[in-house]
Curated annotation (Swiss-Prot):
Family indicated by similarity: Belongs to the Wnt family.
Gene designation per UniProt: WNT-10B
The species this protein was found in: Plethodon jordani (Red-cheeked salamander)
Alphabetical keyword list: Developmental protein, Disulfide bond, Extracellular matrix, Glycoprotein, Lipoprotein, Secreted, Wnt signaling pathway
Protein name, entry field: Protein Wnt-10b
InterPro entries tied to this protein: Wnt, Wnt_C
Subcellular location: Secreted, Extracellular space, Extracellular matrix; Secreted
Length: 117
């Protein structure tokens, strides 16, 4: 009579917040690769080490400026958008106004009521 032993190993996906945080850091440190017509398909980074480059993000086209209106990519820009001055999220004035400044608009809503005095 023999005995049988099982061992099970598995990988668990990390929390989405952790993954997104790592990706954001990599995005902010991404390296621009200047491509040209003489490109042979071989990339020789001068300042980057091969091991580091394998774990980092690289890009060869600059992102469009989403602050300004661009009809080619159907981007309306952010001018005239309402921002939240107390927010630290995507709707914050720092993100939406793109350094152009913003105006503070105070509004007092008026509603009809059937009040009698």
């Amino acid at each position: 009579s023999g005995s049988c032993q099982f061992k099970t190993c598995w990988h668990v996906t990390p929390e989405f917040r952790l993954v997104s945080s790592v990706l954001k850091e990599k995005f902010q440190r991404a390296t621009f690769i200047n491509s040209h017509n003489k490109n042979t398909g071989v990339f020789h980074p001068r300042r980057l080490k091969k091991k580091r480059l394998a774990k980092e993000l690289v890009y060869f086209e600059k992102s469009p400026d989403f602050c300004e209106r661009d009809t080619k990519v159907d981007s309306p820009g952010t001018q005239g958008r309402v921002c939240n001055k107390t927010s630290h999220q995507m709707d914050s004035c720092g993100n939406l106004c793109c350094g152009r400044g913003h105006n503070i608009l105070m509004q007092t809503p008026s509603e009809r009521c059937n009040c009698r005095f």
